[in-house]
Each structure stands twice: as C-alpha cells, then as structure tokens.
Regions:
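Catalytic alpha/large subunits of respiratory electron-transfer oxidoreductases
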Residues: 1-192
Length: 192
C-alpha cells in the first residue's frame, strides 16, 4: 500500500517491483471503501481556473472549504463576481464563504437519490457552464460506486462538467503510473 501523496517516481518503482515479485497486491486508494466500479482518480473535466467562469456549481458530498481551499476560493469568486448559483448536496450543513442558491442536507444513505431532485436538475439545466464537483464524502462513502453513477447520470442529464476531487495529492499520477491492484484492492488486502 502506498499513500496517495506518494510521488510518481516512487509509485512507478513500487509498481514495477511488485510486478517483478509476481504480486498484483498494490494500491494507493487507501481511503476508498467501495471498489465495485473499479474507479480511479481522474483529472477534472475542465481546468481549475475555468470553474470561476461557471454559472451553476453543484457541490456533492464535499466540504470544499476543508478539502480544497483553493477551489473553494474559485467557487467564491464565481459566486460573488459572476453571480454563479451554487448548490450543495451533503450529509452535513457545512459552512461556506459564499451564498448557496439551494442546499439539500440528507442522510448519507440518501445522497444518490438527492441528485435526482427535479428542482435541482431544472435549475442546472438552464445554465450554460454547469459544474458538478464530487468530494471526499461521496468518494469514500460505503456505496461510492452508486454515488459516482448518480453523479455521472446527473452530469449527462444537465450537461454539467463532472469534476471528482482526487482522494490524495497524487492520486491521478499514481493511477496513471500503474499503482493499482491486479489482484486484491485495499479492502481485500485488509480483509486477509
């Protein structure tokens, strides 16, 4: 197991070492619990700076102020300078430094269904540059695969750019460098 902040060169060497030893038991997704959709970290669907140009932003399962303060600031800028409408769908009523056009505070088991809310979908459908940001609470949820599926469905229905926050400083780099299981994932390794 490697921490998701491990540098690319170390992750790549570890992956090659594991392969040379005949082991496919390696992973960097130490915070994830649901691997049923074999999800890995991926780059945002748009450049980070472009989020300031969004006119509708949906925060899904994230305390963005804590997870990525720089992104929180860009959302604040979009909200205050461009009047972007920001919506939050979370299990906790987090404090943000920008105003929310709407929020749904739901039980963790109801997060996936919250994105099916017709009012939220209609509000976002009218936007020209909508963005859906999926955070740690969704990515590390016990049913994260269903939450990711709900996020993909919502993004497709509304035309929103899907931006999943990587769960580690170098999670995208490690995924690209092969630091992924060929056999057992993190949950499987700990179960043994």
């Amino acid at each position: 197991l490697a921490h998701p902040a491990t540098p690319n060169d170390e992750g790549s060497l570890l992956a090659r070492l594991a392969e040379g030893l005949g082991s496919g038991n390696l992973d960097h997704r130490i915070f994830n619990r649901d691997f049923s959709d074999a999800a890995v970290a991926e780059p945002f669907a748009m450049p980070l700076a472009d989020i300031e140009q969004a006119d509708a932003i949906i925060l899904f399962g994230t305390n963005i102020r804590h997870e990525l303060p720089l992104l929180h600031q860009r959302i604040r800028k979009a909200n205050t300078h461009r009047n972007a409408k920001v919506y939050a769908v979370n299990p906790v009523d987090f404090d943000f430094a920008f105003s929310l056009a709407g929020k749904q505070i739901v039980a963790p088991s109801k997060l996936a269904n919250a994105l099916e809310d017709a009012t939220l979908i209609d509000a976002v459908k009218g936007a020209t540059r909508p963005v859906l940001i999926v955070g740690a609470l969704a990515e590390n949820h016990p049913q994260a695969a269903s939450l990711r599926a709900a996020a993909r469905k919502f993004a497709a229905a509304t035309g929103a750019a899907l931006c999943r926050i990587p769960q580690g400083a170098n999670a995208v780099g490690l995924a690209r460098n092969g630091m992924l299981p060929a056999k057992r994932d993190v949950v499987g390794m700990f179960a043994e």
